[in-house]
Amino acid sequence: MQRLAKLISNAGICSRRDAEKLILDGQVKVNGIIVTSPATNVDTDNQVEVSGSLITSSQKSRLWIYYKPVGLITTHKDPLSRKTVFEQLTGLPRVISIGRLDLNSEGLLLLTNNGDLARQFELPSSKLKRVYHVRAYGNPDPLLKSNYKNLEIDGIFYNPQSIKLLRKNSTNSWLEVILFEGKNREIRRIFEHFGLKVNKLIRTEYGDFKLDNLKPNEYREVTKKLYKC
């Protein structure tokens, strides 16, 4: 027996939180009957439908590294009808993302068909390193010389692990930022706080996984032995 929301998440339909919302909205049936409690327990032999589609509770956990291009949002449905990551993917089963990259950011995005695996990666206790290469307009010295750790901006505390200069020319600088727990628009807000305008932001690493030679909108599957689930 397992919770209905967990089963839906593990099937790669959506995150557990979104699964709970689908259940509360009456979009889920168990053995043909609408169920509205996310805490409902189900057996593996129960028939579960989400928005009219039958799902299976048992499947092999899989993980992919995807190069998310600029201009796509990391969601399955967007109320503003913007293009999403999942609309662009071909040749993959139903997957969910591990974390997000915003509309104007690009680079490494992990995808999985297992909600529990996604949750394991996203937990702060996992302490997985995220590496970003950032191109910014302006003088980076005030940022680099500051005590940027435990920085408070508009009541929110940010704590990047490190920020270092990679290269610099007369107008732009490339910097490497390492985070262990990323907050919404954290890098952009830190840079803006020091008068820097971010004009390119690429995530190059997440935990043990690297973008390597992937190009925008390309993906590759990760060998199972390289991760635990």
UniProtKB/Swiss-Prot annotation:
GO terms for biological process: enzyme-directed rRNA pseudouridine synthesis. InterPro entries: PsdUridine_s_RsuA/RluB/E/F_cat, PsdUridine_synth_cat_dom_sf, PsdUridine_synth_RsuA/RluA, PsdUridine_synth_RsuA/RluB/E/F, PsdUridine_synth_RsuA/RluB_CS, RsuA_PseudoU_synthase, S4_RNA-bd, S4_RNA-bd_sf. Residues 2-69 form the S4 RNA-binding domain. One of its GO terms (molecular function) is RNA binding. Keywords: Isomerase, RNA-binding. It is an enzyme of class 5 (isomerase). It catalyses: a uridine in RNA = a pseudouridine in RNA. SMART domains: S4. The active site is at residue 102. The keyword Isomerase applies. Signal peptide: none annotated. The keyword Membrane does not apply. Its EC number is 5.4.99.-. Belongs to the pseudouridine synthase RsuA family. This is Uncharacterized RNA pseudouridine synthase RBE_0321. It comes from Rickettsia bellii (strain RML369-C).
